[in-house]
């Protein structure tokens, strides 16, 4: 024979639907705030691939010039310079005394363009939407707002 205890229910376990929905809403709100910040952080982390490589190539060009009194034929311009995952590099020798090295973003870094000349003049040719160019444009933009 089964007997029941009058008026006593077993305590319920688990979550109600409304509790789960509130938790999902909070997680979605936090993700909507965190993901754009994370993307900006990753983008800022990829910019040094361009600036460091341009600086290295510029030093190689100057070393070549010291030995040969000309930039024509410098290894910084003749070697394969497309070695970065996020940037394509190129070199233009205008005269024996002048060159321009440039880096153009690709993939997730599309929209970025940096350059440096034999006079060590650095410039940012382009930035993606949401970023700004500095005024005057004599540096490499590394953060949103035209910050160099």
What does each of the following model-derived ranges do?
Residues 18-28, 48-52, 56-58, 128:
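Short, charged low-complexity linear motifs
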Residues 1-10:
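N-terminal secretory signal peptides that target proteins for export/translocation
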Residues 10-38:
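N-terminal single-pass transmembrane signal-anchor helix
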Residues 42-70:
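Membrane-proximal N-terminal amphipathic helix
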Residues 2-3, 62-148:
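Periplasmic/extracellular, small/polar-rich flexible segments of pilin-like filament-forming proteins
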Residues 12, 44-48, 52, 94, ...:
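Residues at secondary-structure transition points
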């Amino acid at each position: 024979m089964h007997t029941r205890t009058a008026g006593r229910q077993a305590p319920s376990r688990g979550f109600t639907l409304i509790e789960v929905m509130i938790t999902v809403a909070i997680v979605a709100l936090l993700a909507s705030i965190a993901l754009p910040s994370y993307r900006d952080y990753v983008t800022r982390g990829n910019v040094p691939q361009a600036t460091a490589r341009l600086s290295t190539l510029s030093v190689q060009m100057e070393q070549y010039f010291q030995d040969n009194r000309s930039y024509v034929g410098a290894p910084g311009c003749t070697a394969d310079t497309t070695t970065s995952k996020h940037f394509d590099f190129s070199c233009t020798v205008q005269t024996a005394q002048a060159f321009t090295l440039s880096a153009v973003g690709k993939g997730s870094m599309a929209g970025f363009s940096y350059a440096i000349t034999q006079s060590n003049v650095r410039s940012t040719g382009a930035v993606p939407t949401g970023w700004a160019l500095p005024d005057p444009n004599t540096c490499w933009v590394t953060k949103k707002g035209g910050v160099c």
